[in-house]
Amino acid sequence: MSRKKLPIGIQTFAKIREGDDYYYVDKTGFALQLIEQGTHYFLSRPRRFGKSLFLDTLAELFAGNEPLFRGLQVHDRWDWSRRHPVLRISFGGGVIRDAQDLEGKIAELLTINEQALGIACTQRENRARFGELIRQAHAAGGERVVVLVDEYDKPILDNLTRPEIAREIRDGLRNLYSVIKDSDAHVRFAMLSGVSKFSKVSLFSGLNNLDDISVDSRYSALCGYTETDVDAVFAPELPGLDRDEIRAWYNGYNWTGEAVYNPFDLLLLFQKREFRPYWFETGTPTFLVDLLTERRAFTPALEQVMATDALLSAFEVGDISTEALMFQAGYLTIGQVQRIGAQPRYRLRYPNLEVKASLNEALLLRYLPEPASVMRQTGQLYDLLLANDFPGLQTLFTAFFASIPHDWYRNNPIARYEGYYASVFYSHFAALGLDVRLEDATSHGRIDMTVLFNGHVYLFEFKVVELTPAGQALQQLKDKGYADKYRARGEPIHLLGVEFSRDSRSVVGFVVESLG
């Protein structure tokens, strides 16, 4: 198989398919399944995951552009004699600042669709004009209309820090989307996609026939690349790259079905031949980091979150749950599904090394007063671990906490809660991309933190001396026999008891015992 062009940043199906110059992962089987099994859909996926390309694929399919689909799954199962008018609405371009901006953008999008379909609407108010456009498009060709809405939520997300403006924009969008329900007799298929999942009550009032496929095992791999896709489609790009490292860095997103790789990351990896957090770097989650800091999130607990459907959907202007934001934005994914009665509960986790390391690094930069020192200290931490220099580790962390100015503690609420010290400790290790396991279960209890690195096992127990007597951290590791779980590995095991003082804001105990 010869190498092809990498479709980096291309959201146009025709551009990828014309000439067969680009790699293409065939998603048309999913398109056919959706069309055969329903009519109105909603899909939430993180940014840069291929939502726009999938909607464009649907548009070309309904428009009957048969040459583009030759050799694909859908080709021999589609009636190419029928062509449906397609209305395309995308809020991906630019930033909408207020409700007036929104109305102007909607008017512009409706004009573009009128011109594309050769229709001149007489109504001028946007809601009425949208309805007229759907009716006229149906009447003109005799086939019912397809409505595709991309980045349906971006105008709201761009204004989350201004709740009143965000609510006005939400109401304007709800007014627009309600037309789809009112025009049901003229609509063959409709799909709305975006990053967030606002409730039907707040944004899709009346669209009660909207099938949410965001967390659906059948469509878990609708966006993104599967293991099979990587090995089959991108085989010419794999030589020279460690397959296990690719998997660790970029695989792991799951919506209760088949796991997928982040497509944006993979394409840039194949282009640049270097492992980097490409997806994370394209959109620093300032809003998320601010929220986690403000809510004093205990960072070690972020990869142990249990959530229900209701919690994952708790995304409203001015009332956003931490779990919903992290899940919908792509910083957490579903690791396991448990059922309690008829209700599913989801254990969330970081999807991969890229997200875990990069998010913890971003949090460290917020937790600490001198961002430049963070990079220096994480580098020192790696070298000290490599050498098993435990006195050096103690010196590093003791000096680190001691170097934080008292004014910063006084002015930063995050430093006044007990979990702050363990959070900073954990985030240093996680930011290095090490195999860090939290609340590691054994038959005797749970280890606070386990780090597996360079053929060694490190077991950590954290204590706050104002809450427990000094010396208890290491003793608990020994009394509970936590090392037993890892003895079969035949690797050196190190027990580390770390004690913090809330009053003195420092590491006051750091005791290590190494086992053969």
From Swiss-Prot:
Pfam families: AAA-ATPase_like (PF09820), PDDEXK_9 (PF08011). This is Uncharacterized protein in vnfD 5'region.
